[in-house]
């Protein structure tokens, strides 16, 4: 027989107040206490919105308005559970706790919302690399991978390969921006020589000259095309549903994108690591060189590469930044968080929602009484 779980810690109202005075952000749901101090800067509604509710019962906030939090958001909250509120019940705050606690006892439907995350009973062993385990999940993989957790992920046994599978955010601009600048300078000089022609592989008589004044337009075309590529890759490759009986396709999905949905705030896995990124970027470069004249294809590639850098930096900021309420990035952050926690089959645009509008995959705005 398995040993009984240890009793939950308990805190008096005065103990909670001392922690709040020290700067911690504790909230409660009924008598259950949660320490959100490490999460406040990630909150999609902004840090101040969450800190303003420190010490309060957030039950009404979870149910809306402005929106009803999803099952994943409630499950996420349970990972910050620290114990129970005890002691003399004073004022409306404590009376609400008693009332909600009684509701929990009589309403079985509320039980899953208060279920504590048990790492020892998860479908995988978090003490071991995950990549070799996820393929065995089969039909359970898709549901499991879309239930986000707060902890970091280890993929490989080898420290070397593990190190190559993650990176810091600033490696992206450090490595790729100098290449963008070099390619832009090099291909602009080629345009300036006046020897760039289109359709020379088909005809010399009707080949079209490409003046250097076209350089900015081609560069911007590359940025624009990247936004479409970003959308298509995210929607059709990253969000493919691997066959439940394919061990290796499940592994492939997890290493490409599933790991990010499982641990959305693992900062070392938010941007593409340089080594695998260089292989993909190299393929795009070769394709453009085969299709277009060198200077034209290279200029479009340079713009696309800058578009990729902007995408990765935007993606990182949407997870770890705190944009001003009502700003473009604030709305983009809210859109992306909904994609992670509730709408994994829509909202595929990261740096822009343009293509979600075009392909009708925009996350719908719903009244707060409906779960988002």
Curated annotation (Swiss-Prot):
Its EC number is 1.14.18.-. GO terms for molecular function: fatty acid 2-hydroxylase activity; free fatty acid 2-hydroxylase activity; heme binding; iron ion binding. GO terms for biological process: ceramide biosynthetic process; establishment of skin barrier; fatty acid biosynthetic process; galactosylceramide biosynthetic process; glucosylceramide biosynthetic process; plasma membrane raft organization. Zn(2+) 1 binds at residues 234, 239, 257, 261, 339. It is found in: Endoplasmic reticulum membrane; Microsome membrane. Binds 2 Zn(2+) ions per subunit that likely form a catalytic dimetal center. It catalyses: a 1,2-saturated fatty acid + 2 Fe(II)-[cytochrome b5] + O2 + 2 H(+) = a (R)-2-hydroxy fatty acid + 2 Fe(III)-[cytochrome b5] + H2O; hexadecanoate + 2 Fe(II)-[cytochrome b5] + O2 + 2 H(+) = (R)-2-hydroxyhexadecanoate + 2 Fe(III)-[cytochrome b5] + H2O; octadecanoate + 2 Fe(II)-[cytochrome b5] + O2 + 2 H(+) = (R)-2-hydroxyoctadecanoate + 2 Fe(III)-[cytochrome b5] + H2O; docosanoate + 2 Fe(II)-[cytochrome b5] + O2 + 2 H(+) = 2-hydroxydocosanoate + 2 Fe(III)-[cytochrome b5] + H2O. The chain crosses the membrane at residues 168-188, 213-233, 271-291, 292-312. GO terms for cellular component: endoplasmic reticulum membrane; membrane. Pathway: Lipid metabolism; fatty acid metabolism; Sphingolipid metabolism; galactosylceramide biosynthesis. Keywords: Endoplasmic reticulum, Fatty acid biosynthesis, Fatty acid metabolism, Heme, Iron, Lipid biosynthesis, Lipid metabolism, Membrane, Metal-binding, Microsome, Oxidoreductase, Sphingolipid metabolism, Transmembrane, Transmembrane helix, Zinc. It holds the Pfam family FA_hydroxylase. Zn(2+) 2 binds at residues 260, 315, 319, 336, 340. Residues 219-361 form the Fatty acid hydroxylase domain. Heme binds at residues 43, 69. SUPFAM superfamilies: Cytochrome b5-like heme/steroid binding domain. Residues 8-86 form the Cytochrome b5 heme-binding domain. The keyword Hydrolase does not apply. PANTHER family: FATTY ACID 2-HYDROXYLASE, FATTY ACID HYDROXYLASE. FA2H is stereospecific for the production of (R)-2-hydroxy fatty acids. Plays an essential role in the synthesis of galactosphingolipids of the myelin sheath. Responsible for the synthesis of sphingolipids and glycosphingolipids involved in the formation of epidermal lamellar bodies critical for skin permeability barrier. The histidine box domains may contain the active site and/or be involved in metal ion binding. The N-terminal cytochrome b5 heme-binding domain is essential for catalytic activity. Belongs to the sterol desaturase family. SCS7 subfamily. This is Fatty acid 2-hydroxylase. It comes from Macaca fascicularis (Crab-eating macaque). The lineage of its organism: Eukaryota, Metazoa, Chordata, Craniata, Vertebrata.
